[in-house]
Amino acid sequence: MVSNVKSFLNWSQSQLPNVLSPRLDSEVLLAHTLNLSRTQLRAQFDRVLSDSEKKIAKKNVERRQNREPVSQILGYQEFWSINFVVDKNVLTPRPETEILIETALNCPSPFKILDLGTGSGVLAIIM
């Protein structure tokens, strides 16, 4: 029976066999539901979840089962230590784009960058 953080994480992970990182996704989704960091979540494995917390968390797991990106479930994606709002209408910033920015910032100045609005706008904002 799912009653505390640890049992919910175990259940959630078992529900996500077709995602790349079921444990990570489970932790991120539950931490978000409880308004905790992942570190805080791990320190509270014995915390009993309320019925409303379980209901919201299970709904988020169902969304992830349907292959909805974690960032869209959360409503944001962290990029260069900044949270950017995302939804189904925005391309989620990818980690590979951070490498692109690091490479560009190491280029000799001056240089020009053109961002044609093909995503979330993180390139224009960060650069």
Predicted regions and their residues:
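A general structural signal for well-ordered alpha-helical segments in protein cores
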Residues: L9, S26-E27, A57, R67-V70, ...
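Compositionally biased, low-structure terminal segments
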Residues: L9, W80, P110-K112
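Conserved SAM/SAH cofactor-binding pocket of Class I
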Residues: P95-M127
